């Protein structure tokens, strides 16, 4: 029967897309078209009665917690494999986090350390799984290693200085310089270096091995150099440029400028060791124009004179490039000069020649020269120094102006305008005096005034003269008159008025005001006015007093004495004045 079923023929149903046996195909096709329908989305056959349920359960749109919309039948798969907000467990602490924050958390969590119970070391949490494989081996490797003493680190620059000096020596010999160096200067240099080493440094195994390797390398290079023909200057120039760039990498200068600065520093260092005489001997070898330095009076070529005077000027106070003690003056050969340079490289002074030590000092305190005297000072002190510098132009002019006489001591000009301006700024008057002047001005008579004289000044002068010239009242003691000052312009004006009165320009009853005294002593004063009636004098004083602003103290003193000597006449003058006023 099974063989019969396998051998029977089938046909494809157009509705449900399934293979149906031929003998049952007609009945199935009728039933399928009546009861079964095809889903338009998933293309699967479903009963027509369950089609709505299928669409609502499988193909409706839902929103995931990551705000993504998809069909409901795909939501489960999305949440398990694709959703970025799905939960995941940290591999270090078993904490559930979203997949977005899991990587950041694992990096932070794995950076923690935990103490290993076997080796006693702190191990990172992320390395705990692989730590048992290497646990205990790192301690054995450290114990087998040879510890490098601290002195070996201190001598690292000494080794670099030896290597740099040796390389520079070879490059200089290859360039055929004008001054000839000794054939084997390195041997003497190496011996000096080893004599300077202490016994503790010689016993260091690592340091000795480094030195041996260095000298073996030097000997090997010398043998290769003797066997090979001389090369062209391209490779040597490249090595020299590399050495200069290495030594001046902090300067930021061009290669040519850096090379000039380097050799200038070498020459100045040699000069500090051997004195200026050795440098002058080297420079004097060439037939050049030699000029004397204005500070040390040594002869130098014309091209190097400015640089030398800059460093030789005592007022510049330039710091020395060499910290060692200077040797006594004497003529040194070229090989001795270069030996000193190599010794500086071995004694940690090559960094000063390269300008490395100065850069460290600059970081600590900036040194700036004074713009007036050139003395180099720290940045904090420079401002106060320049403010009090002796060579500052503003400060120098103050010293010069001290010897110039003041304007007060110079003779005054004869211009009449200057005294008038000065009178207005003289001593202040008391308040009581001003009140009296105002009251008398309101009651007193006025006279014709010239347009050139101010009215207030004339009125005040008139009141003062009328009070001073009037005699004492009967039964009262004569009081001394107030003292007024007379300026130059007013005195000249009064003298002109006196001359006009004598010529008849003024009425005969008017008299002139007192002239300024010729002496400081009141005994020598001779009055210039006639002894006329007091009433006329009072009238004259009223008319002429307006032109006089102040009266000299000597004239006032003379009036007080005259009043005391002749009381009867003054009393009679006072009675006559009262009669005229009535």
Swiss-Prot record:
Domain of life: Eukaryota
Keyword Zinc-finger attributed: yes
ZnF bounds (TRAF-type): 27-103
GO CC term, one of those recorded: mitochondrion
Record function comment: Negative feedback regulator that controls excessive innate immune responses. Regulates both Toll-like receptor 4 (TLR4) and DDX58/RIG1-like helicases (RLH) pathways. May inhibit the LTR pathway by direct interaction with TRAF6 and attenuation of NF-kappa-B activation. May negatively regulate the RLH pathway downstream from MAVS and upstream of NF-kappa-B and IRF3.
Residues recorded with modification Phosphoserine: 191, 278, 320, 326-327, 409, 415, 430, 470
Protein name per the record: TRAF-type zinc finger domain-containing protein 1
Keyword Zinc (UniProt): yes
Originating species: Macaca fascicularis (Crab-eating macaque)
């Amino acid at each position: 029967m099974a063989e019969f079923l396998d051998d029977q023929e089938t046909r494809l149903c157009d509705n449900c897309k399934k293979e149906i046996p031929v003998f049952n195909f007609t009945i199935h096709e009728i039933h399928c078209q009546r009861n079964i329908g095809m889903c338009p989305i998933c293309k699967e056959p479903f009963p027509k009665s369950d089609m709505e349920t299928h669409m609502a359960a499988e193909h409706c749109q839902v929103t995931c917690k990551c705000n993504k919309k998809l069909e409901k039948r795909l939501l489960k798969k999305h949440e398990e494999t694709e959703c970025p907000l799905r939960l995941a467990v940290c591999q270090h602490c078993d904490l559930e986090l979203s997949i977005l924050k899991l990587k950041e958390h694992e990096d932070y969590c794995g950076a923690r350390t935990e103490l290993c119970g076997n080796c006693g070391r702190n191990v990172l949490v992320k390395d705990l799984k692989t730590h048992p494989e290497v646990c205990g081996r790192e301690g054995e490797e450290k114990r087998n290693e040879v510890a490098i003493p601290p002195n070996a680190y201190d001598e690292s620059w000494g080794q670099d200085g030896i290597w740099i000096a040796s390389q520079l020596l070879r490059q200089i010999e290859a360039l055929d310089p004008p001054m000839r160096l000794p054939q084997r200067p390195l041997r003497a240099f190496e011996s000096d270096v080893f004599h300077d080493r202490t016994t503790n440094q010689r016993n260091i195994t690592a340091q000795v091995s480094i030195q041996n390797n260095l000298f073996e390398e030097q000997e090997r290079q010398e043998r290769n150099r003797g066997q090979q023909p001389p090369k062209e200057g391209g490779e040597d120039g490249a090595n020299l440029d590399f050495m200069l760039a290495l030594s001046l990498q902090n300067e930021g200068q061009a290669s040519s400028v850096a090379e000039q600065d380097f050799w200038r520093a070498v020459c100045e260092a040699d000069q500090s060791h051997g004195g200026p005489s050795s440098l002058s001997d080297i420079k004097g070898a060439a037939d050049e124009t030699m000029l004397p330095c204005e500070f040390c009076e040594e002869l130098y070529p014309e091209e190097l004179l400015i640089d030398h005077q800059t460093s030789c000027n005592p007022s510049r106070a330039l710091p020395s490039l060499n910290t060692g003690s200077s040797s006594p003056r004497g003529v040194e050969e070229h090989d001795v000069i270069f030996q000193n340079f190599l010794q500086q490289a071995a004694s940690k002074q090559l960094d000063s020649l390269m300008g490395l030590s100065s850069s460290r000092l600059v970081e600590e305190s900036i040194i700036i020269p004074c713009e007036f005297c050139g003395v180099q000072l720290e940045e904090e002190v420079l401002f106060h120094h320049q403010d009090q510098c002796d060579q500052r132009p503003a400060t120098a002019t103050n010293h010069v102006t001290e010897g110039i006489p003041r304007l007060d001591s110079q003779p005054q000009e004869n211009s009449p305008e200057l005294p008038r301006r000065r009178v207005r700024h003289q001593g202040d008057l008391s308040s009581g005096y001003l009140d009296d002047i105002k009251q008398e001005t309101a009651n007193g008579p006025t006279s014709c005034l010239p347009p050139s004289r101010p009215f207030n000044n004339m009125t005040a002068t008139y009141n003062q003269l009328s009070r001073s010239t009037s005699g004492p009242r009967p039964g009262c003691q004569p009081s001394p008159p107030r003292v007024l000052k007379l300026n130059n312009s007013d005195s000249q004006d009064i003298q002109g008025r006196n001359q006009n009165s004598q010529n008849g320009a003024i009425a005969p009853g008017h008299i002139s005001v007192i002239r300024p005294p010729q002496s400081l002593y009141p005994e020598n004063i001779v009055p210039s006015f006639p002894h006329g009636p007091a009433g006329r004098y009072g009238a004259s004083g009223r008319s002429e007093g307006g032109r006089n602003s102040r009266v000299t103290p000597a004239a006032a003193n003379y009036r007080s004495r005259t009043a005391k000597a002749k009381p009867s006449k003054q009393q009679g003058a006072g009675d006559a004045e009262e009669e005229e006023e009535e």
